[in-house]
Curated annotation (Swiss-Prot):
Pfam families: PRC, RimM
UniProt comment concerning the protein's domains: The PRC barrel domain binds ribosomal protein uS19.
Quaternary organization: Binds ribosomal protein uS19.
Name the record gives this protein: Ribosome maturation factor RimM
Principal location listed in the UniProt entry: cytoplasm
């Protein structure tokens, strides 16, 4: 399975540097000098390889200089490029409570009594923490956002394809978070 570890947001300066939106927990390894990156534009099949020539932090953003990308025009041509890895390249975690996003996506979400809630469709990362985006099961339409914290997500079994949750009262209600006037 192909996983996105970064995306070229834009060029930076006139010497071919690019700004990368990091989508990995290990940017210091993935984007280290000498690292070979595989990248492609969204919805394109052709994958190109790039070697990192220089990497630095600038105002909280990752800037890269890649071999063969020596000016702003070449850097601009990379805008939107997705840097990818194969999930088989990931090191298995030694921590039983640590998961990669792709391991959680597709899990069946159930209550402790076995009642099916839905399926994890995405893991959202926010300043407040991770959220599981869950497509509701059965005839219930919509999406639920469940904080991925131990107090709510009580058990995850990737092998069994199941996450058990113990939601606080109201979290599963369709109108949770809406005001009385429906806004």
């Amino acid at each position: 399975m192909e996983l996105v570890v970064g995306r070229v947001a834009k060029s930076h300066g006139i010497k071919g540097e690019i700004v990368v939106e990091v989508r990995t927990d290990e940017p210091e390894d993935r984007f280290a000098v000498g690292a070979v990156l595989r990248g492609h534009k969204p919805r394109e099949q052709t994958v190109s390889t790039y070697t990192v020539e220089a990497a630095r932090d600038h105002s909280g953003r990752l800037l890269l200089r890649l071999e063969g990308v020596s000016d702003r025009t070449a850097a601009d041509a990379l805008r939107g490029t997705l840097f990818v890895i194969d999930s088989a390249e990931l090191e298995p975690s030694d921590d039983p409570d640590e998961f990669y996003d792709h391991e959680l996506e597709g899990l069946s979400v159930r209550l402790a009594d076995g009642t099916e809630v839905g399926t994890v469709i995405e893991v959202l990362h926010s300043a407040a923490g991770e959220l599981l985006s869950i497509r509701r099961a059965g005839d219930q339409s919509g999406e639920l956002l469940v904080p991925f914290v131990a107090a709510i997500v009580t058990s995850v079994s990737v092998a069994d394809g199941v996450a058990l949750i113990d939601p606080p009262e109201g979290l599963l209600d369709p109108d949770f978070g809406e005001s009385a006037d429906g806004k």
